[in-house]
Amino acid sequence: MSEPTANTRPFAHLHIHTEYSLLDGACRIDQLMERVKECGQTAIACTDHGVMYGCVQFYKAAKKAGIKPIIGCEVYVATRTRFDKVNKIDGNNHLILLCKNETGYKNLIKMVSAGFVEGFYSKPRVDKQLLEQYHEGLI
């Protein structure tokens, strides 16, 4: 990240993986907040892969640092439906979802949970039906 200057526009990272994105995330939440603050940024999103394990810790750390927390998730979207589990056909596509409000947060929790309970195929997967059902309050 570059240091802010007087001529820079406000900037917020909207695609960050924390230590809760297993095998992918290298950011420790507390250290991340320190760096975001050092760079003069006022907001940041947490979009771990398929999980929301770190959202509460992320939210509390951001608030404590005076940074606006944006809760989200990089969900895995099944090619056909979350129930289909055929190798080479039902791969995963990635989609970043961000919560606009409390309704979006609740809907994202429901969607991610359904991905684990109903759509798990090496990774928790959602599908178009879940996106249609739980889209309210999400970007």
PLM region descriptions:
Residues 1-139:
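Phosphodiester-processing cores and adjacent nucleic acid-binding clamps
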